[in-house]
Structure formats: C-alpha cells, structure tokens
Amino acid sequence: MSKIVVALGGNALGQSPEEQLELVKGTAKSLVSLIQKGYEVVISHGNGPQVGSINLGLNYAAENGQGPAFPFPECGAMSQAYIGYQLQESLLNELHVLNIDKQVVTLVTQVEVAGDDQAFNNPTKPIGLFYTKEQAEQTMEEKGYKFVEDSGRGYRRVVPSPMPINIVELDSIETLIKHGTLVIAAGGGGIPVVKEEGNYKGVDAVIDKDKTSALLAAHLKSDQLIILTAVDYVYINYGKDNQEALGEVTVDEMNQHIADGQFAKGSMLPKVEAALQFIEKNPEGSVLITSLEDLGDALDGKIGTLIKK
C-alpha cells in the first residue's frame, strides 16, 4: 500500500466557516477516493487566511474592551481545530456513505523551530485577508504590521516563517496511522515552538505548511508528497506570453528554475523548496503539485507537475 501525505492549501478552503464547510465537502470526496484506490493517506493543511482572520477578530475585540488579546500560537491552535473539525466531519460523512469503517482524528500539532532562525528578523509568510494598497498602508501605520503584495491579488500581512526542525507529536501520529486511523496533522505548518532548557514555548510565527508537510512525509517514509494548490501545474514564466507548464521534472531542473528566479517567494517558491527538501531526505519518493480539482487525473499522470530525483 502506497503511503502519501496530502497538503491542502489554506487559500483553497474559503474565507468564511460556511464557505469552507461547503468546499471541504468536495475535498473529502477527493481524499476518500484515494483511500478507495488503496492509498494510505495522511492529511495536512494550510491556515494562512484562517489564522489571520482569527487573530484579527480577537485583537479587534480586545481593542474594543470585549476580551483579551490572543498570542499567535493560540490562534494557530484554534485554526488547527477549526479547520480540522470541518475536514474530520466531512471525511467521516463521506466514509459513512461509502461504508468504509475508518476513524478520522485531528491532532493539534506543535513543530519545533530554532529560536535564532533568521526568519524572525525578516517576516515573509502571508496571512489573513487581502487588502488594497491604501488599506495596507493605513494598517501598517496604525499597528506596525508588515505587508507585501501577493501575486497580483492584493496586499497581505506577513509574519516570520522559520524552518521546521522537529514535529513534537510525531510518535503519536505514527501510532494512529499504525492503527488504521486517517490522521489530520500539522495544520498550518504546526504551532511553532522553541525548546528552552527542555521545555517548549510557543512563538509568534507561521511555519510554511508545505515545508512541515515535507518534513512529516520524510519522517513517515511516504512514497509521495502531494501539494494541492490553486493551479494545475507549476509554471515557469508565469503570467507571461511564454508561460510554460512543467510536467515531469527532475530535482536538478527545479533547482535551475529556482536559480533563474522563476517562482514567487510568497506563493510557488516555498512549495517547490518543500518538494526538493522531501526528495533530499527521501530520494525514492516523488512530489506531485497540482490543484484539488485535477487530483484524480494527476494521479493518473494526465496533468500536474511531478518532481523526481
């Protein structure tokens, strides 16, 4: 049985609980179809829009005397539970329809990062809602947040995105998998924690979910990491007249494309970097990057970008 880790993009999950629940129902059908085909599946997901909205809402309430402000690690934990619950419910319902007897568990996951990671001095991870340039400038002036333009879609707040070095609950994830459980873990890249004198402490950051998914997939010795995003392929010369979709490519070819500056820092670059990190740790594995809608065809080799050693 092939083991795969599927990383869902947070932006593909919608902007509200109602929209997300409807989208997740379709996602569940696609994921359960993998189980029907005989794959052993582990699920991770992004949380960029969701954790940003949670943080924004709670801080707005605090500023208006309606409750305390919440630190980012707690907001990350809330987003893991919120997204995980909706995935869990939809997956269980779809499994029930198909008479598949399988438990689904969302595991709130901490991921260790280095306290001296240079990312803390250079925020790059987009979170939350999209703003106009004027809105972003006003919020920067009022709150001191850093904003960047995100792939032509508007401006988003950015926070530090340190490298994941250790998944704290890895043993628990492996135990659940061995017992046949469908596991949702490392949501949003995991809650970032640093280790101080043997104790863990949460820090204000968002770990890139694809890089944590790559680390998880490598530890689990997965046959494949699937990164689901908004596009059907990885492209070079994206948005230009000579735009080109990448089909099956090697690690060396992707490294050359990175050197040529082909991938945007806030969107496709971390996905490609995560793919290469997984293959570096697990040379026999491969990475498939495509959209959720095209997943079935991508697994049949008809579409999507497949990266191999």
From Swiss-Prot:
It catalyses: hydrogencarbonate + NH4(+) + ATP = carbamoyl phosphate + ADP + H2O + H(+). The keyword Cytoplasm applies. Pfam families: AA_kinase. Keywords: Arginine metabolism, ATP-binding, Cytoplasm, Kinase, Nucleotide-binding, Transferase. Its EC number is 2.7.2.2. Pathway: Metabolic intermediate metabolism; carbamoyl phosphate degradation; CO(2) and NH(3) from carbamoyl phosphate: step 1/1. It comes from the Bacteria. It is found in: Cytoplasm. It is an enzyme of class 2 (transferase). Belongs to the carbamate kinase family. PANTHER family: CARBAMATE KINASE, CARBAMATE KINASE-RELATED. This is Carbamate kinase. It comes from Staphylococcus haemolyticus (strain JCSC1435). The gene is arcC.
